[in-house]
């Protein structure tokens, strides 16, 4: 073999090794890749039933339904479309109606999203960019943090109603 052929064989074998390594990494991560959808995107382009994905938006007011066995049903909306969500477990402390939420799980054949985990929006820094952009585009984005450093006009309640402090 000439020098040129040896160099070409070395480059070709290096490319094969790199391609094989990339293929193995992609194969190992295939279960960890989760696609993100808004309710509108999910309505326009339905995901495959059982495929892992994330949905994000606002918890629709008056949609929260708590069952006795820690099962919670609620609706995620982006003000255009809604997605019914079922979750079993403890919800984050910041979870409430009208707030931003991201749920990760799978869409069942009946159209209900079964969430394995639910993340509540803390403030706009933690909202996925896609959700924030969709909400801003629809005019329902709520700016937070405008009153930082200012005391609240409503005093904090220190005792339950009806209790007397001694």
Swiss-Prot record:
Among the GO biological process terms of this entry, one is: cytochrome complex assembly
Q: Name one GO molecular function term.
A: metal ion binding
Assigned keywords, A-Z? Cell inner membrane, Cell membrane, Cytochrome c-type biogenesis, Heme, Iron, Membrane, Metal-binding, Signal-anchor, Transmembrane, Transmembrane helix
Chain's role: Heme chaperone required for the biogenesis of c-type cytochromes. Transiently binds heme delivered by CcmC and transfers the heme to apo-cytochromes in a process facilitated by CcmF and CcmH.
* Family membership noted in the UniProt record: Belongs to the CcmE/CycJ family.
NCBIfam families hit by this protein: PRK13254.1-1, PRK13254.1-3, PRK13254.1-5
Can you name this protein?
A: Cytochrome c-type biogenesis protein CcmE
Positions of the UniProt region annotated as Disordered: 139-166
Topological category with respect to the lipid bilayer: Single-pass type II membrane protein
User: InterPro entries from the entry?
Assistant: CcmE (IPR004329), CcmE-like_sf (IPR036127), NA-bd_OB-fold (IPR012340)
Classification via PANTHER family? CYTOCHROME C-TYPE BIOGENESIS PROTEIN CCME HOMOLOG, MITOCHONDRIAL
Residues passing through the membrane, by range: 8-28
The stretches that face the Periplasmic side, renumbered to this chain, are 29-166
Record's subcellular location: Cell inner membrane
HAMAP family, alphabetically?
A: CcmE
| Gene Ontology CC: one annotated term | plasma membrane
Q: Which residues lie on this side of the membrane: Cytoplasmic?
A: 1-7
Q: Taxonomic lineage per UniProt?
A: Bacteria, Pseudomonadati, Pseudomonadota, Alphaproteobacteria, Hyphomicrobiales
Q: Which residues bind heme?
A: 122, 126
**SUPFAM superfamilies recorded:** Heme chaperone CcmE
Q: Which Pfam families match?
A: CcmE
